[in-house]
């Protein structure tokens, strides 16, 4: 049973990693002036970067310093703040990525807690995972194991689908709204 639960955890990590890559790609493409189905974002700086690589290196240097090489994308609160720093928002401005993340922030935080629990075995990750399962399902799981949770049936689904399927479908749907 433990091997099957580990496979569910691995599948979730793969889906969540794809979600993070999607967020990162959309963000940097927005900074380069790429048009999405709803239009083009307006930047705080007033001008677009000429390449994705330049946008990425500039943002990383500005946020983390010249020696940093990457940013983390798992925390929706941090991604929303990042969007607000570089993309104009408010009346008359699109700020699509920020809007979608903000409107789904609590749910995305819970998904990040599931991810955090899979990759970290400490008190903080257990506490946050238990908080997520209590909010989503009204219970905690033995030893705070995400595999058991991801294999469990989602009672809010009209079909007999597991939480892993629910979360994957949600992430795909949110990504589709941003492109």
For each predicted feature, which ranges?
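Helix-loop junctions and short alpha-helical segments
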Residues: 1-114
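Polyanionic, low-complexity intrinsically disordered segments
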Residues: 103-107, 114, 120-179
């Amino acid at each position: 049973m433990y091997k099957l639960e580990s496979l569910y955890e691995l599948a979730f990590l793969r889906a969540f990693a794809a979600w993070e890559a999607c967020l990162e790609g959309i963000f940097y493409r927005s900074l380069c002036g790429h048009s999405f189905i709803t239009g083009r974002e307006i930047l705080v700086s007033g001008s677009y970067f000429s390449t994705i690589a330049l946008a990425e290196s500039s943002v990383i240097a500005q946020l983390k310093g010249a020696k940093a090489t990457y940013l983390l994308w798992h925390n929706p609160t941090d991604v929303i703040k990042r969007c607000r720093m570089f993309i104009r928002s408010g009346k008359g401005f699109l700020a699509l990525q920020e809007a979608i993340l903000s409107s789904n922030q609590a749910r995305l935080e819970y998904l990040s807690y599931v991810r955090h629990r899979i990759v970290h075995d400490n008190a903080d990750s257990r506490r946050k995972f238990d908080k997520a399962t209590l909010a989503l399902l009204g219970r905690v799981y033995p030893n705070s194991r995400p595999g058991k949770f991801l294999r469990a049936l989602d009672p809010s689904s009209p079909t007999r689908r597991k939480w892993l399927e629910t979360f994957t479908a949600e992430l795909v749907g949110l990504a589709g709204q941003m492109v």
